[in-house]
């Protein structure tokens, strides 16, 4: 699972993502934002039944399907030349992401339970995996920006072989036994989803948590999608994009390494409040 977490996203694309879509697919920034908003909604809708679907067909099969779809979506990005290519790619990204989210975290948590590990072990594992992914992104970013000076498509093509790694490892996973868990029919799962949605709508705390996550996610997306145009606006040559991305990802890597310890000391409530200015201030600046 660690390899899947590290190589989940294209390694050589992050530092030139927006500029490559603008130039290769001939899209404006406004069109990219609109497309992203539509696809996030699609992902949220599809994400609702994926947990139940993972219970029915199995976590491993869900992960395999998600990674196959994810690999296919990036092929559309790698060879994009028109806006509709990115529409297909992003819709596939939404579907693949929903399938993976319905299985990967549950599979890790069930494995932790099987190994008699507590919730802090899961947080530490998740932080370490995220940190290594940030570090890999950072180390690959300068290479990507230098290649992009010659051809914007080169970094995308270079990312393809690494996306095979999570796909192959998904086939090699062993799903832990779910002892004591009663198997439910499709009808039972549908009733559970209906009851879950009703209970969620009635619980103000859950609604506030969902709103908080939406705001944090949207703010992060805005920042991530705005840095390429900002670099261009201030006249920064593309070959330096990757070096700035390297610094940012090293900071993210260090934060992930010690994130679980900081969260454990500060507590969930304080950590949640600290995240708001940490994400909001950079956007304002």
Report the location of each language-model feature.
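Transmembrane alpha-helix termini and helix-breaking/packing motifs in multi-pass membrane transporters
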Residues: 20-24, 134-159, 229-236, 260-265
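Cytoplasmic helix-loop-helix junction between adjacent transmembrane helices
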Residues: 91-134
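Cytoplasmic membrane-interface "Motif A"-like loop-to-helix N-cap segments
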Residues: 56-67, 264-277
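C-terminal ends and interior cores of transmembrane alpha-helices
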Residues: 68-82, 277-285
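Juxtamembrane intracellular "pre-TM" segments in multi-pass secondary transporters
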Residues: 175-211
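Helix-loop junctions on the cytosolic side of multi-pass membrane transporters
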Residues: 152, 157-185
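Helix-loop boundary and gating motifs at the non-cytosolic
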Residues: 1-45, 203-246
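Helix-to-loop junctions at the C-terminal end of transmembrane segments
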Residues: 45-58, 148, 254-268
């Amino acid at each position: 699972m660690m390899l899947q977490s590290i190589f989940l996203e294209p390694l050589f694309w992050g530092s030139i993502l927006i500029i490559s879509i603008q130039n290769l697919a001939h899209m404006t920034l406004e069109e990219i934002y609109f497309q992203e908003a539509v696809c996030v909604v699609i992902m949220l809708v599809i994400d609702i039944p994926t947990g139940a679907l993972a219970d029915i067909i199995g976590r491993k099969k869900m992960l395999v399907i998600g990674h196959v779809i994810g690999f296919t979506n990036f092929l559309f990005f790698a060879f994009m030349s028109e806006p509709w290519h990115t529409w297909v790619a992003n819709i596939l990204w939404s579907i693949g992401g929903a399938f993976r989210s319905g299985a990967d975290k549950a599979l890790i948590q069930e494995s932790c339970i099987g190994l008699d590990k507590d919730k802090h072990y899961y947080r530490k594992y998740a932080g370490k995996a995220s940190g290594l992914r940030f570090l890999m992104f950072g180390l690959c970013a300068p290479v990507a920006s230098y290649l992009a000076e010659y051809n914007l498509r080169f970094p995308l093509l270079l990312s393809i072989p690494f996306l095979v790694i999570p796909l192959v490892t998904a086939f090699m996973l062993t799903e832990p036994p779910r002892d004591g868990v009663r198997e439910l029919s499709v009808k039972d799962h549908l009733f559970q989803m209906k009851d879950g949605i009703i209970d969620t709508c009635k619980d103000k705390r859950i609604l506030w948590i969902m709103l908080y996550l939406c705001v944090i996610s949207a703010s992060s997306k805005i920042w991530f999608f705005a840095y390429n145009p900002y670099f261009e606006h201030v006249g920064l040559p593309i070959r330096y994009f990757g070096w700035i991305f390297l610094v940012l990802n090293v900071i993210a890597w260090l934060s992930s390494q010690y994130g679980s310890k900081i969260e454990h000391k500060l507590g969930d409530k304080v950590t949640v409040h600290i995240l708001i200015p940490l994400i909001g201030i950079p956007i304002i600046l």
